[in-house]
Amino acid sequence: MKTWIYLALMMSLNFNWAQAADKDGPALKFVEAAAKAFREGKTDEALKLAAKAVEAEPKNLNLHYFKGQLHSKLRQHAKAAAAYTRVLALKPEKDRVADTHQERGEAYFKLGKIKESIADFDVFIKAYPRQDPHHWQRGISYYYANEFKKGYEQFERHQTVNRNDVENAVWHFLCLARAKGIKEAKAKLIPIVGDGRVPMMEVLALFGGKSTPAKVLAKARGGGVKGARLERQLFYAHLYLGLWYEATKEKKLRDQYIGLAAAVADNHDYMGDVARVHAELNKIPVPKVKAEK
């Protein structure tokens, strides 16, 4: 499965965090065994081994971080947040403090703890001011915290470093529509050229008043694509149709499309979590859907 390849890569990227204080001690051996089990898809075994590593060296903050990463990849967000909180309690050096707040902020967002996510993202950005324009995650959190002015300003800054992303234009629109009305949001829709992801340019046209929901869905289903690619294209169509209907205050249609997006949330990274959190915060029923063929 491509998912496991990705997760194994992520685990290897973070492996240096997990180096035990005693390189010949039991903790490192548990970490190595946990990483191996994870790569083989033996997730329960990996979690047990990571827990044993922490038990062997409970004051080694790197092991708690490793455990948090493992829980995060397995979408166990409450346990991930708890592990990152333990890292911070062990008083890491400045850079690791910031990185841990970023990781915990993402976990908090995925738990629907929006204000807590913003607080953690703020700590990260204070430590790394140059990351501010890159931080679209904080912009999305601002939307769900009803801090719409801060939201559209965040996406305006993000536009300076990510010029061809329809999603940035849409989230800017959504925040501006809530702050100043949909008429002004349409007038100030950020122009995007060159987002090659289907159906994102059609989504942009919809928000600009130059397309329709039916055309967005047709574009997502077009081209003879099947399987995971079709699911991904429909996921983005459903998510942004749901957000469009939220902006136009059509609650029934919003719920329909957000529900469809949330139904496959686990397959679509952070934006999948956005769909799921949106459904949870608004108590939107999530249907069971069959895999796209």
Kindly give the residue locations of the regions a language model identified:
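Short coil turns that delineate tetratricopeptide repeat
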Residues: 24, 58, 92-95, 129, ...
